[in-house]
Amino acid sequence: MSVSAFNRRWAAVILEALTRHGVRHICIAPGSRSTPLTLAAAENSAFIHHTHFDERGLGHLALGLAKVSKQPVAVIVTSGTAVANLYPALIEAGLTGEKLILLTADRPPELIDCGANQAIRQPGMFASHPTHSISLPRPTQDIPARWLVSTIDHALGTLHAGGVHINCPFAEPLYGEMDDTGLSWQQRLGDWWQDDKPWLREAPRLESEKQRDWFFWRQKRGVVVAGRMSAEEGKKVALWAQTLGWPLIGDVLSQTGQPLPCADLWLGNAKATSELQQAQIVVQLGSSLTGKRLLQWQASCEPEEYWIVDDIEGRLDPAHHRGRRLIANIADWLELHPAEKRQPWCVEIPRLAEQAMQAVIARRDAFGEAQLAHRICDYLPEQGQLFVGNSLVVRLIDALSQLPAGYPVYSNRGASGIDGLLSTAAGVQRASGKPTLAIVGDLSALYDLNALALLRQVSAPLVLIVVNNNGGQIFSLLPTPQSERERFYLMPQNVHFEHAAAMFELKYHRPQNWQELETAFADAWRTPTTTVIEMVVNDTDGAQTLQQLLAQVSHL
């Protein structure tokens, strides 16, 4: 009997079962203990294979692939700390709804807690973050193949969002020629091998429920808050709010076109918050709100009803409003709750939004990060997409720009970490095949620097803007102690990215003005390669410009 041959047959059942649940992209890191899984994936023609030497980046690559494809994406890693490196991507997926299938190879039980190399306690190591966790036994013919495939089917068939951790112990030998060991075990699944359906068919229950009193509430004074959603949903929400005559406060990730732009500025004006107090109902569609003033208003508002509609489960309301948490697909929910044509009830807010935008435009000429945030919509590629990093950059775009309705925008705004942003952007580009503009800060770029290796493989032009303000300048917006701010918060690194781009053979530009930036863009969009554009700016100018605009708009 060949242990290595049966390991591979066991793994082949697992991998084939994944294909029945829409898995097409599979991300693989190098490793020996994962050999049965890797070879089974390599032999299965249903998969598109992606590889990376860094498991943390690999997890985020899978996250980006899942964001665009809307399908589960599988990840294969070897045992030990390689598994732990998947934690950040798993956490993010749990908060933003992407489906990740983590296949983690493991040592067999007799090698755990006895000093064996690269052997750690892997079952349960992700605690409550996976939606499902499966600790498989060591491969054995004593367990029927139908148990293995139905176990996989149960976890994936009931998966609505988040990650599944499948821990797969394999005993040595891991290498060897295939023979007939386990062939009859494998063949007991019969014509399942020629079928394309799961062995066990289950489906998560997610049905939009109509609110029977909607006809009553839609005649009231309402406010629509739009969080993270798809491009198509964003366009529908904008039209829905316009028909109702309700003001729409759109997040940078809402893709609604933000009809009342610069909300993070005008929400700091007492006239705006006073007018919003007249709202009898707030309907929030989508979660993960960005703007500080929006979150402050959300926490303090007290309408008669506060509804949150999102297909992700959980409360999603840090302010704990009295109201309704409606778990539903946004587009489906809108169909069940049609708008009734009414005149807009807000008068002051549209005027403030226009004046706030004019205040931003008046400052657009200086070459800085706040001005770049405002101008970013001028640089979006046609038929493309935008990936926005975290920390200061996403807040500036949210506050100072007005992205077009229906233009795809992606980000990691679940746990809002700066780890894995370049890797996620790489996955977003690969899954879509579209021209992509990605924008991150210098610390975010440093954090995921080896992901530049992933950006060597793009199918359409990708431009990575690194806004180099020499540290974590978001802390300039916070009341951090002045005496310790630079050393313990900003942590300036005094680096540039020309040599990093050269190491991975990526094109590089460092423009000094808007004309040079536009020339760099024009060159970048011509070829299906990655271009790194480093925009070096004065350290605190972006944060200071935002603070000045907030003060100016608050007194309009």
UniProtKB/Swiss-Prot annotation:
GO BP: menaquinone biosynthetic process
InterPro entries linked to this entry: MenaQ_synth_MenD, MenD_middle, THDP-binding, Thiamin_PyroP_enz_TPP-bd_dom, TPP_enzyme_TPP-bd
pH-activity dependence text: Optimum pH is 7-8.
Entry keyword set: Magnesium, Manganese, Menaquinone biosynthesis, Metal-binding, Thiamine pyrophosphate, Transferase
EC numbers: 2.2.1.9
Catalytic reactions on record: isochorismate + 2-oxoglutarate + H(+) = 5-enolpyruvoyl-6-hydroxy-2-succinyl-cyclohex-3-ene-1-carboxylate + CO2
Function: Catalyzes the thiamine diphosphate-dependent decarboxylation of 2-oxoglutarate and the subsequent addition of the resulting succinic semialdehyde-thiamine pyrophosphate anion to isochorismate to yield 2-succinyl-5-enolpyruvyl-6-hydroxy-3-cyclohexene-1-carboxylate (SEPHCHC).
Listed name of the protein: 2-succinyl-5-enolpyruvyl-6-hydroxy-3-cyclohexene-1-carboxylate synthase
Species assigned in the record: Escherichia coli (strain K12)
